[in-house]
Design a protein with these regions (language model features):
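Active-site SXXK
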Residues: 25, 38-66, 156
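A short, well-structured edge-of-sheet supersecondary motif
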Residues: 9-30
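Extracytoplasmic/periplasmic beta-strand context in beta-sandwich domains
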Residues: 15, 64-66, 136, 171
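A conserved catalytic-loop motif detector
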Residues: 89, 93, 101-172
């Protein structure tokens, strides 16, 4: 299988891209793959990775209900309209992140796994380093703008491969 990532137009360098063979890690194409970029909603790939880790370690269950905070309710712009005080299952939060890029669901997961989204982002960065994502720094679980939240196309390819290898049971 081939994995590829392209980052959108940026003035100083038109784009970043990488295509790798996920079976052997061979780079088939690369352009500015080590250039720092804002990850935007690709951040949610790590949010999902962290949720899959927690599921694998039995720290959470798919049918477990998570409480929606005011902060989660207030997330914009892409969301499913969760209301503070209501609950969503882990499974539905994951599906909302995958299908809608739901920032409210990503925040609920983050707060449930680490008390606050800031603590969760620190754990995301730590996990990134463990996976070999040397230039990645997360500041939130959603990818909403933060000037210190950066990654590279190469690092996102590493995360993609880790998702496929370490959490293939969640792909169906």
């Amino acid at each position: 299988p081939i994995l590829s990532f392209t980052f959108p137009f940026i003035a100083e360098a038109r784009y970043s891209a990488i295509v790798i063979d996920s079976d052997n890690g061979k780079v088939l194409y690369s352009r500015n793959a080590n250039t720092l970029r804002y990850p935007a909603s690709l951040t949610k790939m790590m949010t999902l990775y962290m949720a899959f880790d927690a599921l694998s370690q039995k720290k959470i269950l798919l049918n477990q209900e998570l409480l929606v905070s005011r902060r989660a309710e207030g997330q914009t712009p892409s969301k499913i309209g969760l209301k503070s005080g209501n609950k969503i299952t882990v499974e539905n939060a994951i599906l909302a992140i995958i299908s809608k890029s739901a920032n409210d669901a990503a925040t609920v997961l983050a707060e449930s796994l680490a008390e606050t989204e800031i603590l969760f982002a620190k754990k995301m960065t730590q996990k990134a380093k463990e996976l070999g994502m040397k230039r990645t720094n997360f500041r939130n679980a959603t990818g909403l703008p933060n000037r210190r939240q950066k990654t590279t196309a190469k690092d996102m390819a590493i995360l993609s491969k880790a998702l496929l290898v370490n959490h293939k049971n969640y792909y169906h």
